[in-house]
Design a protein with these regions (language model features):
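Short conserved catalytic/interaction loops centered on acidic-Pro-aromatic/His motifs
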Residues: 203-212, 225
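Long amphipathic all-alpha helical oligomerization modules
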Residues: 217-223
Length: 256
């Protein structure tokens, strides 16, 4: 059997083949780069669930119950559990007061009734675990506060010297009773806190303190900047401007 001789590939055709192969290689590289970049962006961006926490805390603090109802629906749709949503509303009473917190809880109950009527079954999530610690609540609260601050606390601010009761309530109740409840992480609790303080307005010293704590517990600078952009749709322009100004100062000082 006689073998047919192979015809040489024309140079122009060969160049076209090589050119096409090169393009395909670059496409693969570009897609890989885009994928990695997207992962990085995703890692440094607030999730829909985290944005919902901001919106829920902000609207509750301001008593905007109509908007709160919408963002509670949104949060539950974004896989915020019922217990997490409830805990956000419980946590913020320490900063916005019982009336705002209670109205928020009542609104959540309305939302759950509406969703149940529509056949939506929301995940209730985990309950707070039982605290098994023989230390006093004051000692436990002090330990948690030092963990948030990132250093041992020496001395007390003047207002706590003037009002030892306030010092005790902060340590025993806020940082022990509330922060110990593991339905939310410290990181999530600080997100609730800065959302409330920023939305109430004219609380720059406290906002400065809690933005620093937010960085201490793991929030990134870019995420906090995104937090301020989320506030644009939940509170007034003056509050957003003040929050952005304080955040800029905090980030600058931490890099000096």
């Amino acid at each position: 059997m006689k073998l047919k001789s192979l015809k040489p590939v024309p140079i122009i055709r060969l160049r076209n083949i090589l050119s096409t192969a090169t393009i395909l290689v670059w496409v693969v590289v570009f897609i890989g780069f885009q994928s990695n970049a997207q992962e990085t962006i995703s890692d440094n961006s607030l999730s829909d669930k985290e944005k919902s926490i901001i919106k829920i805390a902000s609207h509750t603090a301001q008593g905007d119950l109509l908007q709160l109802k919408d963002v509670l629906h949104e949060g539950l749709d974004h896989k915020l559990t019922v217990n997490e949503a409830k805990e956000v509303l419980v946590h913020l009473y320490a900063y916005a007061g019982f009336p705002r917190s209670i109205r928020g809880l009542q609104t959540l109950l309305e939302v759950l009734e509406e969703r149940t009527a529509k056949g939506i079954q929301d995940d209730w999530g985990a309950e707070a675990t039982t605290i098994d610690d023989s230390r006093s609540k004051y000692e436990r609260g002090m330990t948690i506060l030092e963990e948030l601050v990132g250093r041992p606390l020496d001395g007390k601010p003047e207002y706590q010297k003037f009002s030892p009761e306030m010092d005790r309530f902060l340590k025993e109740h806020l940082f022990a009773d509330i922060f110990e409840r593991d339905v939310l992480t410290y990181k999530q609790r600080e997100l609730v806190t800065i959302s409330v303080i920023a939305s109430l307005g004219s609380l720059e010293p406290m906002l400065r303190s809690h933005l620093n704590l937010s960085l201490n517990v793991g929030w990134q600078a870019e995420q906090l900047k995104e937090f301020t952009e989320t506030l644009v749709i939940t509170t007034i322009e003056d509050n957003v401007f003040a929050t952005k100004t304080v955040l800029t100062e905090v980030l600058k000082r931490r890099t000096e």
